[in-house]
């Protein structure tokens, strides 16, 4: 019965049958790894697994934004983007370049990780 529950009702059932290479984390990691010593910021949302996939350490204390009302976490992320201090930014917003024009979208992927479809965007700093 437990096995049937897992197969039918597990929240990660949307991932069944997908190859690892089809995940946005691994697709974006391929792009990020083309830059030696790349830096990355997971902007404005919970950690999406992109740091681990790319083999990159977070550049700051607030490497993601949680659901806690901590102004410092947002301020640190805004400061990093204002200073163009990271090579890449991964976000769930498709208009980051409107506020930070030094970054442009180089990849996007719509993905269902079990909580509904979302679109991840990878931005690169314009050189």
Indicate where each model-derived feature is located.
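Intrinsic disorder/low-complexity segments
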Residues: 2-4, 30, 125
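N-terminal functional modules and adjacent low-complexity/disordered segments of proteins
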Residues: 2-4, 26, 117
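Short periplasmic/luminal acceptor-recognition loop of GT-C membrane glycosyltransferases, typified by
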Residues: 14-70, 74-97
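Aromatic/acidic, Gly/Pro-rich catalytic loop(s) in extracytoplasmic/lumenal soluble domains
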Residues: 87-127
